[in-house]
């Protein structure tokens, strides 16, 4: 049975038969250890003869192999593809948003042009950049993206600018209308001006923090049902929108599909932003050993929903490479994909996963086989 849920983590049932799945490895290692009391084992094991040390290393390697790391991803993880560019500049456009839609579109266009003039080959816009962020506004500002033209002036602008400037644009997100449904949708345009991918926010922002903030996107929006990964002139990119970043399974699926970079247009608020915004970006980058880029609207203290700001680029070691505060800003930062292999060689997580204990299942890829 096909499922709209794209992934799941589960424990391999064969291990439930053994309450201590490590016991067989421990018994193997004990053949090389002298009979020691618990108090003295640390000092004595430091003095093992070289032959025993070599044997332990050999067993350690054998153990790692028997952990079946290749089975920790179902289907197996794809190799990291060779990107079209090794180094390039990304532009993060942290924009102010008003109730004037025409102004918002014109303002975003100018910001994209400025980022490109400063060398950006990839430009990322914020979540809901053409509309105020509210359930009342989503139906009013929604566009029929598939119809294009006058039915979707925001995406028409993105298409024109990406083609003219020969850049890739991750178009933040806008409210999308499809029949009687509304989605929070990110459009990706290639350097030829063509729409290469469309990501509808999978995890809707429904929260209630007493005394702080309550917001229910599900009052007006419908959740998307498909993870989105796209090959572009600047590499393979996985797309999420704001709340999507909280779900590590989505990022893990993108990494297993060979993503170089994850892009999350988002609008964290003044409650969750200070605590979680940077933390989640660094976690997704570190766990999956890839780049993570985020872009927020600029803060407007007079708006009904106040964004945290702090658009950021994080490297594959979890390091913050570039960020800003809450005001309008255009960040230009370099991405170097050669670092991905360096980090993955230094910390070979893909060869150390415990496929004998857990697996990440990419339901979409599995169903397509």
From Swiss-Prot:
Q: What Gene Ontology cellular-component terms does the record carry?
A: chloroplast; chloroplast stroma; plastid
Q: Where is the transit peptide?
A: 1-63
* Residues with PTM N-acetylalanine: 64
What Pfam families is this protein classified in? CN_hydrolase (PF00795)
Induction statement? Down-regulated in roots after treatment with asparagine.
Per its record, what are the GO molecular function terms? omega-amidase activity; zinc ion binding
What GO biological process terms does the UniProt entry carry, in alphabetical order? malate metabolic process; oxaloacetate metabolic process
| CN hydrolase domain mapped to chain residues | 88-337
Annotated catalytic residues: 127, 201, 242
* Enzyme Commission code: 3.5.1.3
Query: Which reaction(s) are listed as its catalytic activity?
Result: a monoamide of a dicarboxylate + H2O = a dicarboxylate + NH4(+)
Q: Which InterPro entries match?
A: C-N_Hydrolase (IPR003010), C-N_Hydrolase_sf (IPR036526), Nit1/2_C-N_Hydrolase (IPR045254)
| Function recorded in the entry | Omega-amidase involved in the metabolism of asparagine. Probably also closely coupled with glutamine transamination in the methionine salvage cycle. Can use alpha-ketosuccinamate and alpha-hydroxysuccinamate as substrates, producing respectively oxaloacetate and malate, or alpha-ketoglutaramate, producing alpha-ketoglutarate.
Spell out the PANTHER family in the cross-references: NITRILASE-RELATED (PTHR23088), OMEGA-AMIDASE NIT2 (PTHR23088:SF30)
Q: What is this protein called?
A: Omega-amidase, chloroplastic
Q: Which organism is it from?
A: Arabidopsis thaliana
- Per the record, the gene is NLP3
